[in-house]
Amino acid sequence: MIRYLFISVLIFIISCSDKKQPVDISVIRDSINAISTNKKMVKIDSGSYQAFYGKDSGNIVRVKAFYLDETAVTNAEYLKFLKANPQWTRNNVLRLKADENYLKNWKSDFEIPEGVSPDAPVTNVSWFAAVAYAKSVGKRLPTVDEWEFAALADEHTANASLKPEFTAYILNSYQKKYKYKKPVKQNRPNYYGLYDMYGVVWEWTEDFSSVMMTRESRNDKSENEGLYCAAGALTSSDLRNYAAFMRFALRGSIQANYCINNLGFRCAKDID
């Protein structure tokens, strides 16, 4: 637990030292060729949860019903996207939209990494790339609130946040290494039918850069410095906060063009 606290505080310091502007999804103006997908999505019914970040911390947030992919996007699925949209291959992508680590382990533009399952989550992809993929399949990335709300579920209940064993499972899953090389669906699904919300890869969200802002300032796109840094007042007695803090610290410390070895994504969709 001390190691977790150290890692969290380290990321927290990095995130608080970086004045970030929220990323505007409208910057993705490239022409994207659509691809077909038969990936199963599950319905997440509307509800509420206790938010963790900024001035929303401790507040009850309402989440509308939405659809969410049952698994993270896989290497095979992303390869199909690349073949239809070669401007997003490793050798063609703009550095503005993906750093030098983009798909760094792929053997070539159209060959997935050696020793990694085609059905494993694609990683080393930027937020821009994830948004482009989602656009190609007629979807979007989930919001922070949607992801956090869906991730409250264990195998049996929609909200397991008060179960000590669930918190222990989450924290333990964060210690596992190289899970991103294995196929999805290796663990049992949660209450909704979602696989691998923990312990395989971290996942991009549409509004990941909003963690340093209040809900009000997110709405008007204005900057609000230091609000997220108030999370440093977390007490060591609340393990649930540690788990949430690790996720929000990561989101607060990355930029949209970052590509990380264990960071992938899954897609969401509005309910018409």
State what each model feature region is.
Residues I2-I7:
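Sec-dependent signal peptide recognition
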Residues I32-D99, V125-S126, G199:
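A short glycine-rich, aromatic-capped structural motif
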Residues R29-I32, K55-G58, L250-A256:
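Short, P/G- and charge-enriched loop/turn segments at secondary-structure junctions
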Residues V73, D207-S209, D272:
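Acidic glycine-/aspartate-rich tracts in secreted/extracellular proteins
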Residues K19-N38:
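Sec-dependent signal peptide cleavage junction
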